[in-house]
Amino acid sequence: MTNIRKSHPLTKIINNSFIDLPTPSSISSWWNFGSLLGICLAVQILTGLFLAMHYTADTATAFNSVTHICRDVNYGWILRYMHANGASMFFICLYLHVGRGLYYGSYTYTETWNVGIMLLFAVMATAFMGYVLPWGQMSFWGATVITNLLSAIPYIGTNLVEWIWGGFSVDKATLTRFFAFHFILPFIISAMVMVHLLFLHETGSNNPTGIPSNMDMIPFHPYHTIKDILGLLLMLTALLVLVMFSPDLLGDPDNYIPANPLNTPPHIKPEWYFLFAYAILRSIPNKLGGVLALVLSILILAIIPLLHTSKQRSMMFRPISQCLFWLLVADMLTLTWIGGQPVEHPYIIIGQLASILYFSIILIFMPLASLTENHLLXW
């Protein structure tokens, strides 16, 4: 008799995805972040669902409803801070996941990579809209500044912005629609995750060497399930330490001031995970140019498979490319720091140089380094 796990139409899908899935034996802990992202998504959907039961998407009561959740709802404070800091963990895992893909050449699985880029955009949109919901000062002004960027689009820009706002400024209509979108997007993201996994399981996982590992596979369960659980425990420990000891560490104090359209905060800035893109946006003195640079800073990931000039897939045995990769990481950290600083000397010039370096590394230096390495190996 066949095992029901392998014969039943529903359990068969789960079995082939998480239990009997052939996995390379050599994949390191950098491959844990996919499962961690799945868990982050589940945590965000669950905490978000319970928060939505007590939240009101109305400009008059939104700020007070969040205060009510923290003060009066049973364990509301932990729900709120798990959700807010869970977003930070989500982005830490996301950036590490993308970095892993860049380093080990996982982007050569173009379908999986492109769905991943769409997922990144969807998660960024969701996080931005979620940041608007508490209706504090930074929520309101962040929404105003970021939606206003669309007015840089020639001809249709102004109409587009007013259409998104549902009026002539960020107001009740904007908050209501942002709540609706913030609620629905995670479920769309969940469906996209399925597509992401579908494409991944067509090819199988990459591994640190970048060499096909068809002759050396092990079942996903129990080996990688145990390994993923270790990663999960470490991530949950970090998240709970953050939530219990310093829940406001990554937030902005200005968001504890109710939104006031008549009073602009001294430094309008997004959450820390968008600061690198915000720094690139600010470093170009032209509005349309800045918006294009902002979009391209993420969209540039889509052309990385086309820029792969190396004869090797992974960077494991390519020291010049490795140096450039870590320079890119340092550059992104620099941009993140600059994004949180005021627009004044010397931060302006540092931001501009870091932005130029960001695009130069990806578009020019990395492809050239790969060609150089090919030449040095006499390939």
Swiss-Prot record:
A ubiquinone binds at H201. Keywords: Electron transport, Heme, Iron, Membrane, Metal-binding, Mitochondrion, Mitochondrion inner membrane, Respiratory chain, Transmembrane, Transmembrane helix, Transport, Ubiquinone. Pfam families: Cytochrom_B_C, Cytochrome_B. The keyword ATP-binding does not apply. It comes from the Eukaryota. The chain crosses the membrane at residues 33-53, 77-98, 113-133, 178-198, 226-246, 288-308, 320-340, 347-367. GO terms for molecular function: metal ion binding; ubiquinol-cytochrome-c reductase activity. It is found in: Mitochondrion inner membrane. GO terms for cellular component: mitochondrial inner membrane; respiratory chain complex III. One of its GO terms (biological process) is mitochondrial electron transport, ubiquinol to cytochrome c. It is a multi-pass membrane protein. Its cofactor is heme b. Heme b b562 binds at H83, H182. Binds 2 heme b groups non-covalently. Heme b b566 binds at H97, H196. InterPro entries: Cyt_b/b6_C (IPR005798), Cyt_b/b6_C_sf (IPR036150), Cyt_b/b6_N (IPR005797), Cytb/b6-like_sf (IPR027387), Cytochrome_b (IPR030689), Cytochrome_b_C_euk/bac (IPR048260), Cytochrome_b_N_euk/bac (IPR048259), Di-haem_cyt_TM (IPR016174). Heme 1 (or BL or b562) is low-potential and absorbs at about 562 nm, and heme 2 (or BH or b566) is high-potential and absorbs at about 566 nm. The cytochrome bc1 complex contains 11 subunits: 3 respiratory subunits (MT-CYB, CYC1 and UQCRFS1), 2 core proteins (UQCRC1 and UQCRC2) and 6 low-molecular weight proteins (UQCRH/QCR6, UQCRB/QCR7, UQCRQ/QCR8, UQCR10/QCR9, UQCR11/QCR10 and a cleavage product of UQCRFS1). This cytochrome bc1 complex then forms a dimer. Belongs to the cytochrome b family. Component of the ubiquinol-cytochrome c reductase complex (complex III or cytochrome b-c1 complex) that is part of the mitochondrial respiratory chain. The b-c1 complex mediates electron transfer from ubiquinol to cytochrome c. Contributes to the generation of a proton gradient across the mitochondrial membrane that is then used for ATP synthesis. This is Cytochrome b. The gene is MT-CYB.
